[in-house]
């Protein structure tokens, strides 16, 4: 059973927001908890206990001392952000100096933001002095650091055991990892798009577990039992059980108490937003995450109808392939769109980090007659060709595939196969992510005999590399787009090649396949699109912004003097304001939700409507989708002309 795991974690690493912002985000702990956790997975637990914890304690002891003294933003000094090449502090005094600058940078950011808001409120006489704004900025930093140290103190031996093992296994390649039982559960949830529980997302703030979102369709939503902002005080598994108070627990431990198998009950002691306290009985159920699943839109112009399918992930239930999965859903979407009489199809794989390899093979088969889809080579050199053995084709019309730098793994297999068969035009970034490896999940409980330590978790280990049917690997190189769109990452290297210890690219012999039949004039369509892009004002603005992002990334120092810092902020704001013109773009095409997705539950449909409407609106403002539509129209126009040119009149 293959799993082609995606790169969703890596995506956070490349949320480029310019050099000015990137450096202080580590202090905004509430917004970056996941990133902090990911960074810590590279820390050796032994070294942590001996050295890292000592440094953590040291910083915890002196950061408040630094923040007690007002920062002078008139002093001309700067901070070096080239952390990879910085020397370690030689002693405690040097370490403290480094932290003073880091804290000052974060305070300067808060100071500049609050001062801008304050100056705009002059007309309402809601003015604060500069010193008051500076104090408020330091207090905000202090609160964030308290959250960080609290999070650090909640880590248990099992957490550091997991970190220690991952320190070892990630030396082999970036996708081999140890999954503790809790991490394996999250992995399964992400790849299946569902879990068993109450249907609410939680977060921890000020030692309280709070509801951040009620998931549409879940038990809590169905019975209107909880609301955003409610605080869970205690948890019990039965009415007879003494509730367990959870405020001092790690959030993950509290979540474990709340989640459970379908049709079991949990009793939550809840403090409502209005202050009232009550016990709520909830029957757990399977909760589906709608944002994981495929969805589609009908696109119309004056003369034709087209379709677009968005696939966020190649989801599957590994325990039961017959359950809902990406392939079965895509098939339904295609058939639904065909019933509307579409003349072309766009398959949107942007930001799709991967998933199940079997679903990739099945989906590829919807667009080709039977044949090889991908080659898989194991560690021992054994090669296997995974094939579509079904001669039926569900969609044989014009096909466009949208990709970007975060289309990874399984997405790359699908895009590569369709490209090798000349079955689709690939539109998007210069290349996709570049993950060409296959992982298998090994349950360590089945491997280690005589285990007396409980659930040992699993090992996600890289066992194979996959290759295109033309013999090339997507490792590091990804899939090259047939037509490259400018985007904000155009001048930045993003993907597998930027990770530590990636495997090298190589190639093998091609599989036997037939790519002789094209359904459109490939070269003419591409040329037409390139000409449109070169004349398009919006794409020109995007390209200019991408160059600005690259220049900010290359900056190694930032001024800690307010006037210089403000000048840089204003320059960045000016560049961002130029990009806002893209928001004014509105496609001439008409976009509608494909109603095959409607649930039989009317209340569910009503509550999902807002999310559906937001997605449809985003398509109207998506310049990349608009150009994909232009290509589909070109394809059909050329096909019609080819047919007419072959007609003779005697």
Question: What is each model feature region?
Answer:
Residues 150-157, 178-195, 204, 210-215, ...:
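Cleft-lining beta-strand/loop regions that shape enzyme active-site pockets
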Residues 111-112, 116-123, 134-143, 468-640, ...:
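Conserved functional hotspot residues or short segments at active or partner-binding sites
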Residues 52-55, 60, 64, 68-109, ...:
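PDZ/PDZ-like domain segments forming the peptide/carboxylate-binding groove
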Residues 52-87, 142, 149-204, 265-267, ...:
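Extended, small/polar residue-biased N-terminal targeting/export presequences
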Residues 92-95, 99-132, 139, 208, ...:
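Well-structured core secondary-structure elements of compact alpha/beta domains
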Residues 13-15, 263:
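Membrane-spanning beta-strands of outer-membrane beta-barrel proteins
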Residues 4-12, 19-38, 49-51:
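A glycine-/polar-enriched beta->alpha junction
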Residues 32, 36-57, 61, 65:
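Heptad-repeat alpha-helical coiled-coil segments, especially the extended periplasmic coiled-coils
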């Amino acid at each position: 059973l293959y799993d082609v795991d995606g790169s969703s974690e890596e995506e956070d690493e490349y949320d480029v927001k310019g050099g000015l912002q990137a450096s202080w985000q580590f202090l905004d702990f509430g917004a970056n908890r996941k990133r902090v956790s990911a960074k810590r997975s590279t820390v050796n637990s032994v070294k942590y206990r001996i050295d890292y914890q000592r440094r953590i304690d040291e910083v915890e002891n002196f950061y408040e001392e630094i923040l007690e003294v007002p920062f002078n933003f008139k002093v001309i000094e700067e901070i070096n952000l080239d952390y990879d090449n910085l020397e370690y502090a030689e002693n405690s005094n040097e370490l403290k100096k480094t932290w003073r600058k880091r804290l000052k940078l974060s305070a300067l950011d808060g100071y500049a933001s609050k001062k801008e808001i304050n100056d705009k409120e002059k007309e309402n006489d809601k003015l604060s002095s500069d010193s008051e704004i500076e104090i408020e900025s330091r207090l905000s930093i202090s609160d964030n650091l308290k959250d960080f140290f609290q999070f650090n103190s909640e880590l248990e031996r099992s957490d550091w055991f997991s970190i220690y093992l991952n320190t070892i296994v990630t030396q082999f390649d970036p996708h081999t990892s140890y999954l503790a039982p809790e991490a394996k559960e999250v992995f399964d949830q992400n790849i299946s798009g569902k879990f068993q529980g109450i249907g609410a997302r939680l977060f921890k703030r000020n030692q309280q577990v709070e509801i951040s979102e009620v998931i549409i369709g879940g038990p809590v939503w169905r019975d209107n039992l909880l609301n955003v902002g409610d605080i869970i005080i205690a948890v019990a598994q039965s009415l007879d059980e003494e509730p367990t108070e959870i405020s001092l627990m790690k959030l993950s431990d509290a979540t474990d108490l709340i989640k459970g198998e379908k049709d079991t009950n949990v009793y939550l002691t809840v403090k409502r937003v209005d202050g009232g306290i009550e016990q709520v009985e909830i029957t757990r159920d399977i909760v589906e995450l709608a944002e994981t699943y495929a969805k589609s839109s009908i696109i119309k112009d004056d003369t034709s109808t087209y379709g677009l399918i968005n696939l966020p992930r190649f989801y599957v239930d590994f325990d039961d392939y017959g359950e809902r999965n990406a392939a079965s859903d895509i098939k339904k979407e295609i058939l639904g769109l065909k019933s509307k009489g579409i003349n072309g199809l766009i398959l949107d794989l942007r930001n799709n980090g991967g998933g199940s390899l079997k679903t990739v093979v099945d989906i590829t088969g919807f667009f080709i007659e039977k044949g090889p889809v991908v080659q898989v080579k194991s560690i021992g050199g054994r090669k296997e060709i995974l094939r579509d053995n079904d001669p039926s084709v569900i969609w044989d019309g014009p096909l466009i595939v949208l990709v970007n730098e975060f289309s990874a793994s399984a997405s790359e297999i699908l895009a590569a196969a369709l490209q090798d068969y000349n079955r689709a035009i690939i539109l998007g970034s210069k290349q996709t992510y570049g993950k060409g490896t296959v992982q298998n999940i090994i349950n360590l409980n089945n491997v280690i005999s005589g285990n007396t330590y409980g659930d040992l978790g699993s090992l996600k280990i890289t066992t194979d590399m996959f290759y295109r049917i033309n013999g090339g690997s997507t490792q590091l190189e990804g899939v090259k787009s047939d037509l490259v769109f400018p985007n904000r990452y155009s001048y930045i290297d993003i993907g597998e090649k930027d990770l530590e210890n990636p495997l090298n690219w190589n190639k093998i012999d091609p599989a036997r396949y037939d790519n002789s039949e094209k359904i459109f004039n490939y070269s003419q369509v591409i040329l037409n699109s390139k000409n449109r892009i070169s004349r398009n004002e919006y794409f020109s603005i995007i390209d200019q912004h991408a160059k600005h992002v690259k220049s900010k990334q290359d900056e190694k120092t930032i001024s800690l003097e307010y006037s210089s810092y403000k000048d840089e902020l204003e320059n960045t704001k000016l560049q961002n304001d130029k990009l806002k013109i893209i928001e004014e773009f509105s496609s001439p095409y008409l976009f509608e939700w494909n109603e095959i997705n409607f649930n039989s539950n009317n209340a569910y449909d009503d509550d999902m409507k807002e999310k559906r409407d937001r997605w449809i609106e985003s398509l109207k403002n998506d310049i990349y989708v608009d150009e994909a539509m232009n290509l589909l129209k070109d394809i059909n126009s050329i096909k019609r002309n080819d047919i007419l040119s072959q007609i003779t009149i005697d």
